[in-house]
């Protein structure tokens, strides 16, 4: 992974998170349909996240996280450092927003039930999309994809870090807990893993051609109707809005990344690079925090959804709030990982981590 490729993937990651934000903002109940053209691209951005995730996970498992302990702690800290604040924010804003404008919180806008405690508990264990379940932690619709992502992490860890009987048992248990709906999109995530493994197989002189071909393929696909070209079977056993389009888009994104890895990427100035890195660091927080903020500000900001002032304020407050909170949360990931490592070592009766020993001696 070169510095340039890492930077460009960071830009793609933030771009995908911003696309999801705009797609949710563009709904009629929030903005009166402003940017309606981008509404259906939110799901496409999530599929891009899956491919990027598979690529990055394959990379770190070969470089920085080469043991099950290191990998598991990193994934756990990555997820829960944002999930816990997101749960608190969602519960708080939902309760206030519902009291102000119940219409924005009807069942047609989210997968709500009459048992919010169970919803949050199942979501915390990533069981909200298992088998035929469709449960969310309050009105936080983007959380659906984390149920998929977390189980892909588990299945990958079982396949890479375990051997023999434990590997088979772990894969079977994870598969049964995840259920078929989550497994349907596993090939999209694995396309990212394949992109990492096969990136060096492409002759460098073909990298630019592959990039152009992928961009042209995506433009042509969307020009002819995009996901509307594909049959969308409806079943509780399938992911939401599932179609063969998911696999086509996933393949295009994976091939695009392989192309990026095989061209000479220009590096921007240091100031711009730092900006991209900082924004990319907020991507996960932006993704998971923006929806409750959009709902909340959609309820409290006065005026009709299609009013100019309402549109500007809701967009600015929700985006600024999500980015600001994400920038505060992101640094906690490293601290949480260190705390989890200490707790794990105590639980297993292992010596404390070196950092803890140094702290005690100082």
Model feature map: region roles:
Residues 58, 79-150, 154, 249-261:
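Membrane-interface helix-loop-helix regions
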Residues 35-42, 107-111:
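Membrane-proximal lumenal/periplasmic loop motifs of glycosylation machinery
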Residues 11-14, 48, 150, 331:
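Generic detector of well-ordered alpha-helical packing
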Residues 43-53, 148-152, 184-192, 249-253:
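Hydrophobic core segments of transmembrane alpha-helices in multi-pass, intramembrane catalytic enzymes
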Residues 73-86, 160, 281:
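Alpha-helical transmembrane segments of multi-pass membrane proteins
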Residues 1-8, 15-18, 22-40, 58-70, ...:
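Alpha-helical transmembrane segments in multi-pass integral membrane proteins
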Residues 170-180:
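Transmembrane beta-strand segments that form the barrel wall of outer-membrane beta-barrel proteins
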